[in-house]
Amino acid sequence: MTSAGEESQNQSHFTYMLLCSDDSIYTGYTTDLARRVQQHNAGQGARYTRGRRPVLLVHWEEYGTRSLAQQREYELKQLSHQEKVDLIARDQNRPAGGVRVPE
């Protein structure tokens, strides 16, 4: 039987950014990226995104531990809006316009 700590180590942890309908950028953390984006678009995500739907997934980073992902989430939240836009624009691994996850 695996402990909760070991299970967490085998799980992917994501830091992500969403482009909201008002052109603001929301940054969050999750272990299930597709589910979390769907929750945001269904109005069941963070309070911030509820009135700014639909949201578009425009950037994500995958980490092996929760602590690393949450540390990166904090770092991203410290960036200015323009710095976030620049990071998204430099992200060569994402399709242009991001990925819209169906509601």
Predicted regions and their residues:
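GIY-YIG nuclease catalytic motif and its immediate N-terminal context
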Residues: 1-56, 60-62, 67-82, 88-103
